[in-house]
C-alpha cells in the first residue's frame, strides 16, 4: 500500500475512532490529532505522520493493533504506536516516557503531542490539576529533547535551529 493511501486510511480510522469525542476546549478530538500530525517541527516523514494520526487510537478507543493491521497500517507504523500507547493501569508515566525514548519516531511524534497538549490557550479555565499535568508534560518533553540532543544531535540541531535557539 502506498504511503498516501496509508495516510488516508489512518485519517479515516482516526476520524471514526474519535467520532463524537470533544476535548475540554470544545474542539472535536480529531483537531488535536491533525495538529499533532501537522507539526512539521517534529513530524517529518509520512510514517511519522501516519503514526501521529493514530497516536491515541489504541490507547483511547476500542480499536487495537490487529484492527489497524487489517486496515492496511504498516508494521513500521504499528511499531511506533506500540511505543506511543500507554498502558496506564500497569505502567507509570515515567516508565512510559522511558519506553518512548527507545524509538526515534515515537519520540518525535510524542514531542508533537506534548506540544499540542501544553497549549494552554486551548483551555477555557486552567485548574490546579491542569497545572500539575503541564509540569509532568514539560518534564517529559525535556527528557525526550535531552535524549535527542545526546543520541541524535543532527535532529536536535535541526529542531533547535527551527525554533531559533
Give the label of every model feature segment.
Residues 1-165:
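Active-site helical microenvironments for divalent-metal-assisted chemistry
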Amino acid at each position: 500500500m502506498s504511503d498516501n493511501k496509508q495516510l488516508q486510511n489512518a485519517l479515516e480510522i482516526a476520524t471514526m475512532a474519535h467520532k463524537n469525542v470533544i476535548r475540554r476546549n470544545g474542539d472535536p478530538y480529531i483537531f488535536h490529532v491533525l495538529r499533532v500530525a501537522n507539526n512539521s517541527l517534529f513530524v517529518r516523514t509520512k510514517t511519522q505522520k501516519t503514526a501521529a494520526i493514530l497516536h491515541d487510537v489504541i490507547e483511547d478507543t476500542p480499536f487495537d493493533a490487529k484492527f489497524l493491521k487489517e486496515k492496511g497500517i504498516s508494521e513500521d507504523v504499528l511499531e511506533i504506536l506500540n511505543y506511543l500507547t500507554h498502558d496506564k493501569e500497569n505502567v507509570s508515566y515515567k516508565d512510559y516516557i522511558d519506553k518512548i525514548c527507545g524509538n526515534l519516531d515515537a519520540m518525535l511524534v510524542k514531542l508533537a503531542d506534548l506540544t499540542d497538549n501544553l497549549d494552554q490557550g486551548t483551555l477555557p479555565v486552567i485548574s490546579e490539576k491542569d497545572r500539575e499535568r503541564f509540569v509532568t508534560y514539560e518534564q517529559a518533553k525535556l527528557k525526550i529533547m535531552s535524549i535527542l540532543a545526546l543520541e541524535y544531535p543532527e535532529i536536535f540541531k535541526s529542531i533547535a535551529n527551527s525554533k531559533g535557539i
